[in-house]
Amino acid sequence: MIKNIALSAFLLISSIFFAQNTAMSTTEAKAFVANVSSETKEIKTLQADFIQTKKMDFLDKSIITSGKMSLKSPNTLSWKYTKPYQYSIIFKENKIFINDQGKKSSVDAKSKTFEKINKLIVGSSNGKMFSDPEFSVKYLKNTNFNIAKFTPKSAQLLKYIKQIELHFPKNQTTVSQVNMTEASGDTTNIVFKNTKINAPIPASEFSL
């Protein structure tokens, strides 16, 4: 459960849009990465509402949840589900703090899996993810979006993640949706809206 929530969280931060995707040229890819990296390195805080849709093979209906994500540079992340249930997960000080409808717990985040997940979530908001040596990256585009498709090189991550797509609207350098395919074939899509960049975030957002 914790790993699924954490993986979904990396889901930090683009769209499943049924347009034809084509590969970017080398020049286009370099320009895209440079632009995103330059713009997002100025991000100190980021907040957004989200809607998450999870499709699982053994369920006929998708599981839809919603909530709020808050990020504070360099590596503090809050992921709070509010509907249809309350569940919070906070990455802070090399630990993962969890509040499952009033039941609180913490997990050491220094394990390779949790450490990587946290790094990827934060990296997706500051452009550093593009240079992560544990992922191969392909760059695609369509009429409305630039797309970065990440495939894990690490055998450890491949146990959980098959592929992650970050979709950036053409006129933006922050992710508007994340689409993840797990090793099992289950998929998770997170759509972000009402995004606020560098707005003050109360300390209470990063505590349970």
Task: Annotate each language-model stretch with its function.
Residues 48-50, 64-66, 163, 192:
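Extended beta-sheet lipid-handling architectures
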Residues 22, 68-119, 188:
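An acidic-aromatic
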Residues 17-51, 55-60, 204-208:
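N-terminal leader/targeting segments and the immediate start of mature chains
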Residues 5-14:
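Sec-dependent N-terminal signal peptides
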Residues 21-25, 37-42, 54, 61-62, ...:
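Flexible, processing/modification-adjacent segments and terminal tails
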Residues 50, 77-81, 96-99, 148-150, ...:
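Short hydrophobic/aromatic-rich beta-strand segments that constitute the beta-sheet cores
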Residues 130-208:
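Gly/Pro-enriched, hydrophobic low-complexity segments
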Residues 57-61, 88, 156-159, 184:
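Short glycine/serine/proline-enriched coil/turn segments at secondary-structure junctions
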